[in-house]
Amino acid sequence: MSLFGVGFLAFAKGKRVCAIGRSSLGKISDPLEVPNLLDLQLDSFDWLIGGPRWRAALDAYRKNPSGAPIAEKSGLDEVFDEISPIEDSAGNMQLNFSKPVLEAEELSVRECRVRGRTYSAPLYVEAEFMNHDTGEIKTQTVFMGDFPLMTDKGTFVINGTERVVVSQLVRSPGVYFERTPEKNSEKDLFSGRIIPARGAWLEFEVDRHDQLGVRVDRKRRQPVIFFLRAIGMTDDEIRDAFGEFESISVQHEKNIGLSRDDALREIYRRVRPGEQASAEAGRALLENFYFTSRRFDLARVGRYKVNRKLGVDVDPTRMVLTRSDIIATIRYLAALHLGFSEVAVLNSNKSVPISTDDIDHLGNRRIRPVGELVQNQLRAGLARMERVVRERMTTQDIEAIIPQTLINVMPIVAALKEFYGTSQLSQFMDQNNPLAGLTHKRRLSALGPGGLSRERAGVEVRDVNPSHYGRMCPIETPEGPNIGLIGSLACYSRVNSFGFIETPYRRVVNGKVTDDIEYMTATQEDEHAIAQASTPLRPDNSFVDERVLVRRKGGEVEVVPADQVDYMDVSGRQMVSVATSLIPFLEHNDANRALMGSNMQRQAVPLLVTESPLVGTGMERYVAIDAGDVLIAEDPGIVGDVSADVVTVKQDDGKHRDYHVGKFVRSNQGNCYNQRVVVRSGDRVEKGTVLADGPCTDKGELSLGRNLLVAFMPWEGYNFEDAIIISQNLVKDDTLSSIHIEEHEVSTRDTKLGSEEITRDLPNVSMDYIKDLDERGIIRIGAEVGPGDILVGKVTPKGETELSAEERLLRAIFNEKSMEVRDTSLKVPHGQQGTVIDVKLFDAVDGEDKLGAGINQRVVVYIAHKRKITEGDKLAGRHGNKGVISKILPVEDMPFMADGTPVDIILNPLGVPARMNFGQVLETHLGWISKQGWKIEGDPDWAKDIRVREAQPDSRVSSPVFDGISEGEITGLFSSVFPNRDGERAVGSDGKAILYDGRTGEPFPEPISVGYMYVLKLHHLVDDKIHARSTGPYSMIIQQPLGGKAQFGGQRFGEMEVWALEAYGAAHALQELLTIKSDDVVGRVKVYDAIVKGYPIPTPGVPESFKVIVKEMQSLCINIEVVSDGEDDVSADAETLQIEEGLDTSPKVEVGSLEEV
């Protein structure tokens, strides 16, 4: 579901309908529609619960088995089959699970969000208990806990908040061989390891003496001949398998008399040193480590990788190791050590090529999507439950046992709760704008349980790998310590059933490009020559050039004859992610700036008025619809009634469908998510037509910012170092205004002294403060509130001494509550203000709401605040060009064009050359051209590739990534722009115009680049950052004010600032800052008293931090006494000094208190 509680799934294969006609200036026509951008999340979870998408994919695979095989069982079926049967130690009893079923959910997504509940469905499973002694079978359907469900937008609602489970990028199970240079010689050392999905590793290595050894479960190394004997190989079998490899033959001859039992004992001794070694113990050890499915699991993908790498033909459903796996691994390693290019497969007439593995290659890394992550957590919960079941089997009366009495579902519920609530991969959803949410769901993380840690990850694993092409974006990644560890899925990529990322290519047959699409993994792609999407083609789809530039394995580029090309890219945007594909002229930008542009688009706040970009890339409509924040028609029909909240459509099948419109909903980041209806009563709508725009969308297109008239010029130094000057018009017209909604919550609980109460009757509070509270004591909707205003009146009982009879009588007569209770009302925090737009009251006593233990009522108040653009706010373009507003100029002072049009924004031209993001200049030029409109007369050479010959003013155009309009074509279009009313073109063919100084009316001496750029307002708003403190909390130890806005702290006067005052000899100012303005506890109380009474400021005393350092030195047994000139002990207790000075009535700070003074 969407944020609004009612979501409408964008159909996966159909066209997205968009009201804006955007003209493409690209040369390539994409043969493949961009797939549904949420498929990664939706398909994976659907497999887990055995939903319709997975069943449809399985049916399609059975009819046409191509590509990676689809899993035959759902995730829930798999995990319950694995744990069945559970037997007691004697083998007399057995418990089996089958047929897991999810019932209907209790609450809708919208209700879960409002009530703070988890969107889930009860999970039931059929449990069968069998008594082997009597042959009796008891079957029951057992409740296994509430199972959190995914909404149709790929999110989970956990305790009322939307969360995303990020897919994890991990090393795939399988067999890997690597070469490491020997430190003290020029030799290379080779090793091979079998890595399971679950269980002990098995490692083989060749040492510097060319001896082949084995490590069991990463313990001490031992000769490989011991292991071969231990798994039951005879002398003849060893000679047949390894006779050609001297390193093994020599070992074999040395240990010719070694028996299997001796080998098992030796292995056990090395793996479990200090324990009694026996052949039986060694046999059990190896059996448990590598040959038992409960302890060792290669998983489907691991078996696939082992079979493919070693050429063995083991059953794909066999998840444990076989002798043939071990023999083939040792043969491969021995052949690799000898420098062979291929090795023959035993008992077969085929051979496999030999090479070492690049662990960072995407053929060796796989995705653990949400379904697998949840399945693993469920498996862990079931394993905990299994122990409880076995325990109960031995303690309960066997006659009275039924499945329900054996099963305790708490371990399963706890495991799922732990995963969704605290796992590193279950994250608070980024709802800053639709693109942020969509990107979050497509994110790939190498961190998390079973993954890397940012401290240990080196440069190699973070770096771009040639196999990322078309699978993982080489540009979009965080800038901080997570760089390279967190990535994003490329536009066209998909994840197969093994977890490997596939990307589509067009098949090339005899030098002719077909429209047959084939998805390939990174390993498959390495075997082919692939041409880029921009390679010129003739009308019959044959290559224009006889020799074509292609990619080969390892990213090598070469030119080959056209008939040797195997495949061709499907689109120019194939290699980049969704956010990066939204940057026009990406090909003209430095990659570092493109990275910043991709990340900053996710920080754009939804504006009051949305406007689609003049210059786009063609991806805007896909993002807007797939993100799920626009309302789209699910079936064709005629629009009936239309209101702000509901759109009714009479469908062609005669049914009426109501579409609920979300109004002023708070997102996770405090932004206003609001939907606006864009259809009218009587309109005809088709399936996929946009009914209502959401935040940051305009007629079904993503619209993160506004098109502003920009000039590249310096202006009085105000745009020095990326600072930005904007026009007062942008403030007055609310061009860059946004609404932000804050949520404030208060609960009443049962305390030892009685229950808290929500009331209007507050002790010692004047009527002015409660004038906007209703009779319940809750703020009315529409009230304007500021810092300190009461939102919800609440009183809490407080303990008292025993009252006399007279006092009790007076209390009863006059009903003085002030003595019994204290005011604990919910107030507007410091620095916040706005209008109350909604109030929600939840009651556990009278209502049906579940509020948790001890909570009687919960009130949630929503306050909205409109923020206009102001100095200190951060603006950015899509090319990594960012800056802070330094000056808002009156419109009459802004530079203006010859026709009197003032520019909206002035940027520093020095921000372009050093950053090498020239795309912003080309966007500015094309923005001007599309704003004015054009008509190409005749058939000039520069226009031969432009399909749009005429465009009206204010047209929307797209310049697709790596297929955009060229500089020569832009220059030509400048000469084809429609002239103004005077018959002149304000901007010349070089993209520059004469601007006039708004203050003097004089023209500037040089022509200036002018045009329309798409500008975003980022979430870094000055109102959230600016902070001031008068009085506030102090640190417990050193009694200095705390730091930071969150703690309502003070401004730090640090070491270097002290040096600055010392340099100027400002001794009194410095003394004041270091004592009475900071941590001279006695002195600051004296100053307060002096200011109140109008006395002169007294002399500062001793700071508390000085006393702390004295105490620290005394704790090191250094006897220190500090005495003043009058022989007084300076370190005397502060409270004593206060009493001596007679200041006992002044406010005090308790040591350790964070209360205000």
Curated annotation (Swiss-Prot):
Keyword terms of this UniProt record: DNA-directed RNA polymerase, Nucleotidyltransferase, Transcription, Transferase
SUPFAM superfamilies, alphabetized: beta and beta-prime subunits of DNA dependent RNA-polymerase
GO biological process, one term: DNA-templated transcription
Keyword Phosphoprotein: no
InterPro entries hit by this protein: DNA-dir_RNA_pol_bsu_ext_1_sf, DNA-dir_RNA_pol_bsu_external_1, DNA-dir_RNA_pol_su2, DNA-dir_RNAP_su2_dom, DNA-dir_RNAP_su2_hyb_sf, RNA_pol_bsu_bac, RNA_pol_bsu_CS, RNA_pol_bsu_protrusion
PROSITE patterns registered for this protein in UniProt: RNA_POL_BETA
Subunit structure: The RNAP catalytic core consists of 2 alpha, 1 beta, 1 beta' and 1 omega subunit. When a sigma factor is associated with the core the holoenzyme is formed, which can initiate transcription.
Protein family according to the UniProt entry: Belongs to the RNA polymerase beta chain family.
Described purpose of this protein according to its UniProt entry: DNA-dependent RNA polymerase catalyzes the transcription of DNA into RNA using the four ribonucleoside triphosphates as substrates.
The protein's name: DNA-directed RNA polymerase subunit beta
Annotated source species: Tropheryma whipplei (Whipple's bacillus)
Protein's gene: rpoB
